[in-house]
Amino acid sequence: GTTCPYVFPFPASPLLAARMAGAVIDTAVLDRSIETLRQRHEWLLVEAAGGLLVPLQEHLVLLDYLAAKQLPLILVTSPRLGSINHTRLSLEALRARAVPLVGLVYNLHGDHPREIVQDTLVECRKALADYGFAPNLVILPDLAESSAAAWPVLVNAARSLCA
């Protein structure tokens, strides 16, 4: 379909999942879906699977596709172990490929020690500055997964990043 042009049964990297399904991810299909949705909607959020450097094709990773299309990115991070490193590596890769960063979402889903939450938040703000990105950071509180009350929080977070 237009909103999700590829769905594969095996939960793996896009390249492996496509291979296992006997398919190839065609970026022209992605391009058509994105363009169709851009024409229909004021806002478009393209959610990717697997991370910035996950392969889409044999010689194409997601981030290179995003860079070629100059699609602005919202990076989501958390206070989990390893997230400072993951966030810094991601910001470095974005800067190296000149991918525009709309902002950073700090997702507090789950139970995390207060000290780690605070330290990781400080480090995320520092990383944005260190890599030359605007300090657009939204803290997303832990929301019940299927709660209708969560939608206003998510909409406000999106608006604050896209303002």
Predicted regions and their residues:
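C-terminal lobe/tail of nucleotide-utilizing enzymes
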Residues: 92-163
